[in-house]
Amino acid sequence: MKNNSSPILSVQHLSVTFPKKGRFFVKEQASDQVLSDINFELYQGKITALVGESGSGKTTLGNTIVGLVRNYTGEFQFEGTAYNPLDMSHLRTEIQYIFQDSLSALNPRMTAGQTLNEILLIHHSNENVDSILEQVELQGEIAGKYPHELSGGQRQRVNIARALAVNPQVLICDEVVSALDVSIQAKILNLITRLVRERNLAILFITHDLNVVKAFAERIIVLSKGEIVEKGSAQEIMESPEHFYTQTLIAAMDS
């Protein structure tokens, strides 16, 4: 097991701008700053929650880490070595992204088993479809079903299984339980917690809902209008929030 005291992934002075669209024949005059001077670390064996309202920049941050956003400045390190998100083919298996929309994330023409088997073959894994499904608490018969035949919770488990198939060290989970009912949310969160413990994963858990992470994450980062307004241990943030925005989120949660 690697040293968990050093960050597996760090983001330093990240800023992201998107160009404003000009009107008709007017040239673009300015840019919208979506993220401003973002700094944080992820640690193996730890769940870090990134919390903020819709439009705060959470998904943009996650997308930038894995190279889905081009207009950024800042530095990224994986295991202490700098990397370029726009040229990270060597890290594709190390950092996996799980999206909110579990249905569109899966190929509708492939069964769950075909989807997983394709990944296992490409990466010459010693795992098999049944063992990967078992790790996410799904029965073998799920392998023969198409995405539209699965429940939302089952589809999200298949997406988690697909990420696990390449044996990653970091998972970015983007609102992965927001479309599920409360009972299914709890089961998925328990699954993620177990996987963190068993696989020593580092998790960036993106959510708008503090209720989801209050007893789930070790650390919380609060994002508002593209800026980190507060970060610290989950206990510190939940019991003694310092920033007004964080206080507002917690008050809304308790109401």
Residue ranges and their predicted role:
Residues 126-141, 250-251:
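Conserved ABC ATPase "signature" region
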Residues 66:
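Helix-to-loop junction immediately C-terminal to a conserved catalytic motif
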Residues 213-215:
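A short, surface-exposed alpha-helical micro-motif characterized by mixed small hydrophobic
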Residues 74-83, 91:
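Conserved ABC transporter NBD signature motif
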Residues 231-232:
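ABC ATPase "signature
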Residues 146-150, 154:
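Conserved ABC ATPase signature
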